[in-house]
């Protein structure tokens, strides 16, 4: 008997909505990354994108433990000398709360074209409203 290999034509992708209110950042990000990769499915194939679409709402209400709210620093660099920028978790949560979950999940996905395709299936919203009602997403409890 041959080993089953999923192909892009045979993969079925579902839509799930995750409420991040009061959830810990790392715990929710790992579950989202697993779902985006498709590792929860029996037909998982490492070189094929078998994951589902994930909609995250209430990203502004995600929490971190300990003193990380004030001490966690996100860095970015422009590429020019002296072009490093830094922003704390608290400031980033006030300015762009979607970016916190996006950065956490993106670091858990593969690097390369397949990882970028998986990341495009993640939709993050700061509030309760999202514009994917037509896809009839199922609620995913994490």
From Swiss-Prot:
UniProt GO BP: negative regulation of translation; translation
Similarity comment: family membership: Belongs to the universal ribosomal protein uL13 family.
A Pfam short name: Ribosomal_L13
Protein name: Large ribosomal subunit protein uL13
A molecular function GO annotation: mRNA binding
GO terms under cellular component: cytosolic large ribosomal subunit
Function summary: This protein is one of the early assembly proteins of the 50S ribosomal subunit, although it is not seen to bind rRNA by itself. It is important during the early stages of 50S assembly.
Organism from which the protein derives: Shewanella denitrificans (strain OS217 / ATCC BAA-1090 / DSM 15013)
Subunit and interaction comment: Part of the 50S ribosomal subunit.
Keyword Ribosomal protein: yes
